[in-house]
Swiss-Prot record:
One of its GO terms (biological process) is chorismate biosynthetic process. InterPro entries: Chorismate_synth, Chorismate_synth_AroC_sf, Chorismate_synthase_CS. This is Chorismate synthase. Pfam families: Chorismate_synt. Reduced FMN (FMNH(2)). FMN binds at residues 125-127, 277, 292-296, 318. Homotetramer. It catalyses: 5-O-(1-carboxyvinyl)-3-phosphoshikimate = chorismate + phosphate. It comes from Maridesulfovibrio salexigens (strain ATCC 14822 / DSM 2638 / NCIMB 8403 / VKM B-1763). Keywords: Amino-acid biosynthesis, Aromatic amino acid biosynthesis, FAD, Flavoprotein, FMN, Lyase, NADP. Pathway: Metabolic intermediate biosynthesis; chorismate biosynthesis; chorismate from D-erythrose 4-phosphate and phosphoenolpyruvate: step 7/7. One of its GO terms (cellular component) is cytosol.
């Protein structure tokens, strides 16, 4: 399997499966002298780890990170940063009864089509658990970007068709669901309880806002900043759509409504989401990701086995009702990895 590395200069390569001994990665290209410790990475991992809140899986993982290389006396050395996270609460026997049956909405059938063999335990490499390594990588990128006065906020704006407002994005990391709207939380909780009682799952929408991005990042045509951000977020398994700025609403707007007018103080609006012609404008870079419902539901579903025989499946095991609260730190991490890479690309080009 290829495709396990993200980035051109600031690179993260990840490894591991949902029910294997552990997961981890190697970060190449991180400059020397960046303050970094296991505690700094752990803070971000704790925001993603399973077993928290009413929407999360019952699987309990401490997700304790161990830095293996590339850090000395609390600072990066400029060499490869290796890290590892153990799996401690996997229950592979939960999948033994469905090992030869394709789960609707999962990558079982496509992995078989490509490789002719697959790890049926929770999806193996295609599991959402793979994203723990991305968050560790994003934590390193965040420390690098902090030196550039660049910060990133990520927050939930919709769950199960119920919209919240962007009222307090700076407090989202303190609130349930990483909500930017405290008032919508009770409605989301009720919706999750309702759907859980039906044996079903929910999706939603996450917004990522990157502040302090200097003008000039991105390359025209095939290496645009917004194109790379969309690629980064779409690489997360549950994401099915990405918008930059006004996004799909721009298709229904007039040019006079969508254009961001300018005056002596700069831009008067930000429908472009901080990117024009694939290059950052100096405004906040705003991206939204549309996340599908978790496909592991306890309702009976029609499917086929590996031999093509029709059958019915009812998925047991431990699964999220809604992945949104745990995917927020993942999307934030992918955005930071992207911007960190572009900062270093810009430096290389002078």
């Amino acid at each position: 399997m290829s495709g396990n590395t993200f980035g051109q200069i600031f690179k993260v390569t990840t490894y591991g499966e949902s029910h294997g001994p552990g997961l981890g990665g190697v970060i190449d290209g991180c400059p020397a002298g960046i303050e970094l410790s296991e505690e700094i990475i752990q803070l971000e991992l704790d925001r993603r780890k399973p077993g928290q809140g009413i929407a999360s899986t019952a699987r309990k993982e401490a997700d304790r990170v161990k830095i293996l290389s590339g850090v000395f006396e609390g600072r990066t050395t400029g060499t490869s940063i290796g890290f590892h996270i153990e799996n401690t609460d996997q229950r592979s026997h939960d999948y033994s009864k469905i090992m030869n049956v394709y789960r609707p909405g999962h990558a079982d059938r496509t992995f078989d089509a490509k490789y002719g063999f697959r790890d049926y335990r929770g999806g193996g490499r295609s599991s959402g658990r793979e994203t723990v390594s991305r968050v560790a990588g994003g934590a390193v990128a965040q420390e690098f970007l902090r030196q550039q006065s660049i910060s990133c906020q990520a927050y939930t704006v919709r769950i199960g068709g119920i919209d919240g407002e962007v009222k307090a994005p700076e407090k989202a990391h303190e609130l349930p669901f990483f909500s930017a709207d405290p008032d919508v939380i009770p409605s989301w909780e009720e919706r999750i309880k309702e759907v859980r009682s039906q044996g079903d799952t929910l999706g939603g929408v996450v917004e990522v806002c990157i502040k302090g991005v200097p003008a000039g990042l991105g390359e025209p045509v095939f290496d645009k900043l917004d194109a790379r951000l969309a690629y980064a977020l779409m690489s997360v398994g549950a994401v099915k759509g990405v918008e930059i700025g006004a996004g799909c609403k721009a298709a229904d707007a007039l040019g006079s409504e969508n254009n961001d007018f300018m005056d002596g103080d700069g831009f008067c609006s930000n429908n472009a989401g901080g990117v024009l012609g694939g290059i950052s404008s100096g405004q906040d870079v705003v991206v939204r990701a549309y996340v599908k419902p978790i496909p592991s539901i306890s309702k009976p579903q029609q499917t086929v086995d590996r031999d093509g025989n029709a059958t019915e499946i009812k998925i047991g095991g431990r699964h999220d009702i809604c992945a949104i609260p745990r995917i927020v730190p993942v999307l934030k991490s992918m955005a930071m990895l992207t911007v960190a890479d572009f900062i270093l690309l810009q430096r290389r080009m002078g």
